[in-house]
């Protein structure tokens, strides 16, 4: 798979096999294409050449045949809604989870579902945890997490890491991009480096 924008090469000859029940780590400097790779794997951007397929159990699936949860760095939710209202609004689109399940995931990530505080009033760490929550709440086949523990305190880091591990045990394909070397070493089964347009297993 390759990706170019106009005449600028972003990713070249990327060839990955991603299987369910595993966590894959991606490391690289800013500007090397990590976020673009995740956008392609999420189906948000089309590759210039090639395709994306996932292995769910023993079955090969095209990108449009799998459910995906995406956390892109600097993503934002609805500023005038509370934590519960944000997740409930997003959940109403696919109707895959109940209000009780939304409350449960909020509790587990350190939120009070009854708190009416607006998202715009949250700290950066709280915003980050809520964006993570929306990525995993519907238990998707594929979870793409760009800097999932960025801006979190120690408690928040542990809450997020534990939930990532649980999603792996459930059988999800999980991809983590992080500058936090501890995240990568603790969580990931395989690690890839993105450098000079290439994605290489290390």
Q: Could you describe each region identified by the protein language model?
A:
Residues 27-29:
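The feature captures the beta-strand-to-loop junction immediately N-terminal to the Walker
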Residues 42:
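Helix-to-loop junction immediately C-terminal to a conserved catalytic motif
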Residues 50-66:
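Conserved ABC transporter NBD signature motif
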Residues 143-147:
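Catalytic Walker B motif of ABC-type/P-loop ATPase nucleotide-binding domains
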